[in-house]
Structure formats: structure tokens, C-alpha cells
Regions:
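Conserved blade-ending motifs and adjacent loop-strand segments that build the rim/top face
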Residues: 380-392, 433-463
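Loop/turn-rich, solvent-exposed surfaces of beta-rich toroidal or solenoidal domains
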Residues: 356, 386-432
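Beta-propeller domains
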Residues: 78-95, 99-107, 115-121, 125-163, 294-378
Length: 510
């Protein structure tokens, strides 16, 4: 992909121009809908695991270079810092009217490119992490309960014109829709309730077009669901849990791709273990939490350390308030546990997921589950906030690396001044961590965006998702609630599809 020659980005240290010029792109008009949301890296992280000492953070990507203030053509503000040559546009901002006549909900969170129509139009489904309150959407919007304000919105984005074409409420009346997962056939988004509030704690399926049924998938478990990664061949769902003592789960549908017919819920267990195994990385605070619940302490883990795993059935996947929780049931059967499971993404036979405050420093772990080998491996652990600050949502980039959304509040000095805002951080298959983008949102008084003014640089990134050809990255700012579309010379670095003169294999099967 090449950018227009008249938009070279920044001069050294200067802001990039506030416009998107796509006139030289060759874009098909219309076309049939195709599957999306399936990044296909060439390799897993075996190269990294073979040489764990090489896993390190670079201050600047040697391929993409420094980050510069880059202006948004819609707001006129430098909301993001990006490498030279990259451009973006904001859209779908909280409180702006949607196509169905209702205000855009706040708290943008998990998201996925669910379908693509030719090479021009992209269908996104986006979560809104809202709790109690009035459901959003016009009359007729599918609503789970009448006292919850969370849900999902669908958006159609025109790549050729870099603008939002249409958006609407697709699910409402749910509670704290945090992350979720894309259906690999491009049919739907699976939205997760991150709560165990009475009557909530389920996952819901939302179609690319139209609206959801608002029927919870009860047999997939009632717990603080965070994210879902769907394996292509089997249709199995791999799910994270956001809790201090959190399981990692597999849901086997009775009928492939028909989630509402139910299925079997299982929890991951370290094979041949004599009881629960604590994989929190040995942090003292988290070990105290485990001990208080009668669970074993964790220990520090080596980069590349791996565990052969198996799965145990959960007897009661939809427990009532007086019943043992899903995690308690699994732990009683020897299940493994983490701390605050967050983002998850499937690609080429592996599920990658994060533990946002896992590890000795409580700044985050990144795990890989090799489905065929049934082996779980620690591929990264952050030693401090500057290296990686509590990874949350995650996606696999077309070039094979991971892109991690930070949710640690930014990095501040002793005087509480920002050293840097929250970042989108790349992790290459060679084990190098590097900054790709930085939250630079500072909104002037009297000109609110999403109902907010002031310094928002510490607010989290969420919902990172690429188009299948790798030319566009869509990502959310949780608060004030903005969706960004980013494009540029991806092929220059490890996130891009083109590497060393060769194209990454698109085949998702090994």
C-alpha cells in the first residue's frame, strides 16, 4: 500500500497534516460480502520462544520510527501520535446522533471488523461498557433487561471516502459489554457481559446486519466474561474471565456456528496437576488473594515457560446466586487460574490472550495457547509500566505480530505529570515490543468531545481490529468514546502484511 506523494507526514518533530487523501487508492465499488476479522500471521511466536532473552522493548520502532502529533481532520485536534506517513480519521463519537436517530452510546470498548463488502465498505460491531441505566436505541431495539445501559452498535465505514456511512443500535439492555470476539466466518460479533450482577454475566451473538435476538448463551457460562476467540475449524469458543481469580474457558457448541442451541462449558487445567495451578506470576498481592481463598500461591515464570493442558467440564455453567461460581466449580476440579484475563484473539491454530495485571510486577502477561498441541506458553511478561502498561484488548496483525491495547492509565513521573499517554504497543514475532500509537487526547474547555474536556491521555485503548488486507486499523478510545480509522505504510514494519519482499500466506489452516 502506498500513500499519496503529497502527504509525506511530518517534518521532524512537527504535526502531520489534518486530512486523509485517498484519491490514488484503487477501491472496488460494492461487491459481495466476504469474511473479515481473521488476521493470518505467517508464524506463531516460536522464534521468540527459542530465544527468550531477545524479548525487549524498543523506545522507537526501527521500522516505523518516532511517534508525532497527528491531526484529526474531523475535530481539527492532534488526538493521536502516530509514525510518519500514517493518517487517521475519527468517527462514531459518543453522543453524536446515529442513523437510527438515537445518540451514540458512551464507553466504546471491544470491536471487530465483522464483514467487508468488496474493498470499499467495512462493517464493524462495537461494544459499549455501560452498567445500570436506561437501555439505548429506538423502539424495537432488542433489549435483554430494562434496567441496564450496555449493548452494541453496528457501523458501516467507507474506506474510499474515509467516512461513516451508517450506524445503529443492535443490542441493548445488557451490562458492562467489555470485549467479545469476532465470528471467523464473518457472520457475527459475540458480545460479553463483564459482570456477575444478578441476572447478568452472559455472552450474546450480534449479526453484521440487522439486530441481535438479545437471547443470552447461558450454557457458555455466567461469569465476568471479557473476551472470546473462536477457532475456525471447530467453532469452539475460548473465553477469558476478568476477575482476581480467573479461569480460562472453552465452550463447545452443540451445533457448529449455532451458539443459541447451547453446548458444553469447560475450564483449562494443567495436565496431570494434583490441584489448581496458579499462573499469576508470583505477585505478592495476588498471592495473598489466592491464599485468602484457600488456593495455592503462584511463582515467578520464565519467558517461554509452557504447560501441557487439558479441559474439565463445568457441571453448572449458569449458576444461581447461591450456587458455586463457574470458577469455583472449575477450581474444585483442579482448574488453572490467572489474574484478570482480558483480550483474546485466534489466529492460525493459536489463541493469544492477556492477563492485564499478571506477572511479578502486575503489569501484564501475554499467553499463547497452541490448540493442536494443547500447550499453553507465556510469550511476554511486562517488568514495568513503561515497557507495557497493563495490556487489555489484543489483536493479531496481518504481518504476524500482536497489537496490544494498554489500560494502565498512562505513565506518570513523581510529580504526577504524564511521561506518556496510553499506547498501542506492537509485539513482533522476533520478540520486540515497540510503540505504534499514543493517546494524545487533550480537549479544550468549551469544545467537548463525547461530553468530555481536558486531558484524556490516560484513557484506555480498546477494540483494535484490522481489515483483512491489512490496510486499515480500527480502534476505540474508551473515554470520551471515539472510534478511529488508521491507515498508512504498514508494510514498512512488522504489523504489515508485506515483509522482506514476500507476502504473508492468507491460509488460516496450517
Amino acid at each position: 500500500m502506498s500513500l499519496p506523494e503529497d502527504n509525506p507526514g511530518t517534518e521532524a518533530g512537527g504535526p502531520q497534516r489534518a486530512r486523509i487523501d485517498l484519491s490514488r487508492r484503487s477501491v472496488l465499488q460494492g461487491g459481495a460480502a466476504v469474511a473479515a476479522g481473521l488476521s493470518a500471521p505467517a508464524v506463531a511466536f516460536h522464534a521468540l520462544l527459542a530465544k527468550p532473552a531477545q524479548a525487549r522493548r524498543r523506545r522507537v520502532s526501527p521500522d516505523y520510527g518516532e511517534l508525532f502529533e497527528t491531526f484529526d481532520p474531523n475535530t481539527g485536534l492532534p488526538l493521536l501520535k502516530l509514525p510518519r506517513g500514517f493518517q487517521y480519521v475519527s468517527f462514531g463519537i459518543a453522543f453524536e446522533p446515529m442513523s437510527d436517530g438515537t445518540p451514540t452510546p458512551r464507553r466504546h470498548d471491544g470491536m471487530c471488523v465483522v464483514r467487508e463488502i468488496g474493498r470499499q465498505r467495512v462493517v464493524l460491531i462495537r461494544n459499549h461498557e455501560l452498567s445500570g441505566g436506561t437501555p439505548f436505541g429506538p423502539a424495537g431495539t432488542p433489549t435483554f433487561t430494562d434496567d441496564s445501559a450496555g449493548g452494541t452498535t453496528n457501523l458501516i465505514f467507507d474506506r474510499h471516502r474515509a467516512k461513516l456511512l451508517e450506524d445503529w443500535a443492535s443490542l441493548s439492555g445488557t451490562y458492562r459489554n467489555c470485549a467479545g470476539g469476532c465470528n471467523p466466518l464473518g457472520r457475527s460479533w459475540i458480545s460479553c457481559e463483564e459482570t456477575t450482577t444478578a441476572g447478568h454475566g452472559y455472552i450474546f451473538e450480534v449479526p453484521a446486519f440487522g439486530r441481535a435476538s438479545a437471547a443470552p448463551i447461558r450454557e457458555a457460562g455466567r461469569f465476568a466474561h471479557e473476551a472470546v476467540a473462536v477457532e475456525l475449524r471447530s467453532g469452539h469458543l475460548y473465553m477469558t474471565e476478568d476477575a482476581d481469580v480467573a479461569g480460562f474457558y472453552r465452550f463447545i457448541p452443540r451445533r457448529r456456528w449455532d451458539l443459541e442451541r447451547g453446548g458444553r462449558l469447560q475450564m483449562l487445567r494443567v495436565k496431570d496437576s494434583e490441584g489448581p495451578v496458579n499462573l499469576n506470576g508470583g505477585n505478592a498481592d495476588r498471592n495473598a488473594t489466592a491464599l485468602a481463598r484457600g488456593l495455592p500461591q503462584g511463582r515467578s515464570l520464565e519467558l517461554g515457560e509452557s504447560f501441557e493442558v487439558e479441559w474439565i467440564d463445568i457441571p453448572l455453567p449458569d449458576p444461581g446466586e447461591a450456587d458455586p461460581t463457574v470458577a469455583e466449580q472449575g477450581l474444585a476440579l483442579g482448574g488453572a487460574f490467572f489474574t484478570r484475563g482480558e483480550g483474546a484473539w485466534y489466529s492460525r491454530g493459536s489463541v493469544f490472550f492477556t492477563s492485564t495485571d499478571g506477572g511479578l510486577a502486575q503489569r501484564g502477561q501475554v499467553w499463547e495457547l497452541d490448540i493442536r498441541a494443547q500447550r499453553l506458553t507465556l510469550i511476554f511478561e511486562s517488568p514495568d509500566a513503561f515497557t507495557l502498561n497493563k495490556p487489555d484488548n489484543i489483536t493479531v496483525a496481518p504481518g504476524g505480530g500482536l497489537l496490544l491495547c494498554e489500560d494502565g492509565g498512562g505513565v506518570r513521573d513523581a510529580e504526577d505529570d504524564f511521561v506518556r499517554g496510553e499506547q498501542l504497543v506492537g509485539l513482533s514475532t522476533d520478540g520486540e515490543l515497540f510503540p505504534f500509537a499514543e493517546n494524545n487526547i487533550i480537549i479544550p474547555d468549551g469544545l467537548p468531545i463525547g461530553g468530555e474536556t481536558g486531558d484524556q491521555r490516560g484513557k484506555e485503548w480498546a477494540g483494535a481490529t484490522f481489515t483483512r488486507d491489512g490496510e486499515w486499523l480500527f480502534v476505540n478510545n474508551h473515554k470520551p468514546g471515539i472510534t478511529f480509522a488508521i491507515t498508512g505504510p504498514w508494510e514498512q514494519g512488522p504489523l504489515g502484511r508485506r515483509r522482506s519482499g514476500k507476502f504473508i500466506d492468507d491460509d488460516d489452516d496450517d
